[in-house]
Amino acid sequence: TDKALRMVISSYTREAGVRSLERQIGEICRKAARRIYEGNEKMIRVTGTNLEDFLGKPKYRPEKKNKKNEVGIVRGLAWTSVGGVTLEIEVNLMPGKGSVVLTGKLGDVMKESAQTGISYIRSISEDYHIDPEFFQKHDIHIHVPEGAVPKDGPSAGITMATAILSAVTGKPVRADVAMTGEITLRGRVLPIGGLKEKLLAAKNAGMKTVCIPKENEQDLAEISEEIVGDMEIIPVEHMDQVIKAAFV
């Protein structure tokens, strides 16, 4: 059925192409043919209910947006060898001496993006009535779940900066907003790669709004309306625009 096919795509494959999908469909056909040959059944109908009988337990968990707006949690978008994925960034604050903890198997470039985001938020702290001594009196822990999976690249810069500002101010971020873009020390948003794959991941996760770099706006012409769908795409040049779109 159509539902079973969608479940195969979302729960049993994770790739940029269709090779793995072809293998999974082949496995279903072989097991169905064996049942018919052995005389157990005359016709096989594969549905969402009996799919596990053919492919076993799902290998992947479909990505879905959070159910409620939360403080210090923002959904980013990443481009991997198997296509686009959503990337949840979590920030927690603890009394301390201003140290920064980064976990989630992050690469050097991503760690540098986190430091850039922190520096930018510190530079605008007066605009948000943040105590100048706040960052000297608190430790910042930035975590990207699925810690066994390596993550790198600069495109989560605006996501981490948004999560940090949310945690520091206590203001929640919309659960239906995703974003991608590199950040500079001045808060400018720089272009990224893999926009098509990232937007597809956002659509599959149920996101309603996606912030992308203004310099990537021209790439939208090459992306089908089927992928963009009903999502609101907001091209941004500066973090001010990201914050306006993301905060509740």
Where are these regions (language model features)?
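C-terminal helical "lid" of AAA+/P-loop NTPase domains
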Residues: I9-S10, R19-E38
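Amphipathic alpha-helical
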Residues: I36, N40-E63
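Peripheral, non-AAA+ core regions of ATP-driven protein-machinery
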Residues: M43, R61-K65, E70-R75, G83-V248
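C-terminal accessory/connector segments of nucleic-acid motor ATPases
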Residues: G48-E52, G76, I89
